[in-house]
A protein has these predicted regions:
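Vicinal oxygen chelate
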Residues: 1-9, 29-81, 87-117, 125-129
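Short Gly/charged-rich anion-binding patches and loops
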Residues: 17-18, 87
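Sequence-level detector for tyrosine residue identity
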Residues: 15, 22, 105-108
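Conserved active-site tyrosine of GNAT-family acetyltransferases
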Residues: 18-23, 92, 119
Length: 129
């Protein structure tokens, strides 16, 4: 039996804002944007070549709105691996991505925490070879 994680849901306040950040600032591919109803779309974004994707879900209830940016209780919830930390850190900084710390070197690789415009925390990581 083969299984994979295909999508991970990420609540956003607005589909357009989510697409603007993940596609515009991070350079992810827009894999799908299908209208399901007047208020709901199926929006998937992912880094080039990724096997799994983020499913951007526009919050539509008070509980969902309250969870935007805090889906992991203030912890880093997402991990973006790269083969060239310096290249991607520079490109993301130039695109206006807000890093919360300077790059640091850990036993597992080079890492820096950044946040999306909604408050979700990410690690940009170049794993140690």
């Amino acid at each position: 039996m083969t299984q994979t994680i295909a999508n991970v849901t990420l609540l956003v306040p607005d589909y357009g804002a989510g697409i603007a950040f993940y596609v515009g600032a991070l350079g992810f591919d827009l894999l799908e944007d299908t209208r399901l109803s007047e208020t709901k779309r199926w929006v998937r974004v992912a880094p080039k070549g990724a096997e799994s994707a983020l499913l951007l879900a526009q919050a539509d209830s008070p509980a969902q709105v309250a969870a935007i940016g805090n889906q992991t209780g203030g912890r880093v919830g997402f991990f973006l691996h790269t083969d060239d930390f310096e290249r991607d850190h520079a490109a993301m900084t130039a695109a206006g991505v807000k890093f919360r710390e300077a790059p640091r070197y850990e036993p597992y690789g080079t890492v820096a925490v950044f946040e999306d415009p909604f408050g979700n925390l990410w690690d940009l990581i170049e794993p140690k070879a």
